[in-house]
């Protein structure tokens, strides 16, 4: 009983104000960071976006004669619009959207100041010369399409048979003929069937063959000379050494001729007997 009373008295003393030593508490980095000095605020700089005016608008302004003074102003960059999305003018419900707008909004939009745009192109632009009446007519004409012609060339439309009388192979119109026939020559096949006689044709063909044969022989014998007239290229001259041909004396040639003649005479005198 005495021990319990002592414990109770010690608990009461601690409650009354007796200081009890406790280990120091660790402080988190998050709380300690708040005690550090506050950094200086970051200075934000304003960015000016410059938009270049297209040449078409400048040319239109020059035509009207209005004095245009380009000024620099802060312009926000407009987001680029993809070519897939059509503008509101081409939509069917564009008229209804415009009709739903209040007149107050329209007046506020019209009263908004126009933004001046910086452009490096001068205002005084020389306009292109005016087109003549003939040029205007030619520009308005539709360009001819050759898609059908290409398709018919790839297909069997330009095939013809020589036995067919109603064939119009020399024109550009396709002919519905079988695939087994040969391709038309657009009228140049008449040049193949010339009116020259057969004798003259044979002579001309023989002459041309001889010419081609002679040209081939010359090409094989004579090597092709490089072209020295190339701008910016310096070709080094090739030094060709001449082959030294051994000179034979006349006495040596006569001796060899005598030896060969003697061998031939012996061969002629030899009698070959076959059993």
Curated annotation (Swiss-Prot):
UniProt keyword terms in alphabetical order: Cell cycle, Cell division, Chromosome, Cytoplasm, Mitosis, Nucleus, Ubl conjugation
Compartment(s): Nucleus; Chromosome; Cytoplasm
Biased composition (Basic and acidic residues): 1-16
Residue span of region C-terminal Sororin domain: 253-275
Post-translational modification: Ubiquitinated by the APC/C complex in G1, leading to its degradation.
InterPro entries according to UniProt: Sororin (IPR018605)
Motif (KEN box): 91-93
One GO biological process term: positive regulation of exit from mitosis
Main location: nucleus
Subunit structure: Interacts with the APC/C complex. Interacts with the chromatin-bound cohesin complex; the interaction is indirect, occurs after DNA replication and requires acetylation of the cohesin component smc3. Interacts (via the FGF motif) with pds5a and pds5b; the interaction is direct and prevents the interaction of pds5a with wapl.
Role description: Regulator of sister chromatid cohesion in mitosis stabilizing cohesin complex association with chromatin. May antagonize the action of wapl which stimulates cohesin dissociation from chromatin. Cohesion ensures that chromosome partitioning is accurate in both meiotic and mitotic cells and plays an important role in DNA repair. Required for efficient DNA double-stranded break repair.
Protein name: Sororin-B
